[in-house]
């Protein structure tokens, strides 16, 4: 499954070792339970990873017994995630569905799971980061019957942000507060490429990036030739944006929208759109 290659090597090492005889169990990191042994007949890494994804939680009572060793649970869950890199997508999807159906019956274990989804799976600095995996869990948790509605809404909202911001997604049209190109909205811009720059108060790197982009001779030339438009995007109170219009680069468009609808985990947050306004 194509998730994040950054931890593929680690996963490969684990699945090759899984099921082999051990002279001694490592003292650390601790896990919740002893992992199942992979049958010797499964020799290919993908087959071994599939087995671990399918059977890792078989003997864990996720439904009735609340986890008390948080570190061990974290180690076990991230090991589970690491197998995804080598496993088939269909196997991963089926396993996540089964896991959620079980863990949804225990609020404590479910909350621990959600905590790791946000600390590791959604974290761009984590080796387990994967928007695809987060969305799989979010969709299954949202479909579960016994899960708190507020938690479902939180996960669904985050999944929607990821969907809005994914490569290939079409950015919804929004009005422009200022447009040197004479366009009323984003869709009115006819350049082959449009850059959305999301302003962020207090972000020094964002300010530096904006200064450099506005001073770029290459970017200015492309704008003059009609090949590029740059939209300076603000969030918050539209009235507060009025005072900032005069400070914007003269050849940039300006917009004020609900910026929370777009992924800004990485700052400066910059989106490059094609002529169809696809990311």
Each model region followed by its residue ranges:
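Bacterial N-terminal signal peptides
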Residues: 9-18
């Amino acid at each position: 499954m194509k998730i994040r290659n950054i931890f593929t090597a680690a996963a490969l090492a684990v699945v090759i070792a899984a099921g082999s005889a051990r002279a001694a169990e490592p003292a650390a990191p601790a896990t919740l339970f002893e992992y199942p042994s992979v049958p010797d007949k499964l020799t290919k890494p993908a087959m071994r990873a599939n087995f671990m994804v399918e059977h890792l939680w078989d003997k864990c009572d996720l439904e009735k017994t609340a986890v008390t060793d948080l570190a061990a649970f974290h180690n076990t869950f991230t090991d589970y995630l690491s197998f995804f890199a080598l496993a088939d997508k269909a196997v991963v999807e089926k396993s996540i569905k089964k896991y959620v159906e079980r863990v949804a019956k225990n609020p404590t274990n479910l909350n621990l799971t959600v905590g790791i989804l946000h600390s590791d799976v959604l974290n761009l600095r984590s080796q387990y980061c994967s928007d695809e995996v987060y969305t799989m869990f979010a969709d299954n948790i949202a479909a579960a019957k016994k899960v708190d509605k507020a938690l479902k809404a939180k996960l669904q909202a985050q999944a929607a942000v990821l969907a809005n911001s994914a490569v290939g997604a079409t950015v919804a049209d929004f009005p422009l507060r200022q447009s040197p190109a004479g366009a009323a909205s984003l869709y009115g811009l006819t350049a082959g490429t449009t850059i959305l720059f999301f302003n962020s108060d207090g972000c020094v790197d964002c300010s530096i990036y904006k200064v450099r982009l506005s001073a770029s001779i290459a970017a200015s030339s492309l704008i003059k030739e009609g090949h590029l438009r740059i939209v300076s995007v603000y969030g918050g109170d539209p009235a507060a944006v009025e005072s900032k219009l005069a400070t914007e680069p003269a050849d940039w468009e300006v917009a004020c929208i609900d910026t929370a609808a777009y992924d800004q985990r990485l700052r400066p947050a910059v989106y490059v759109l094609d002529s169809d306004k696809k990311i």
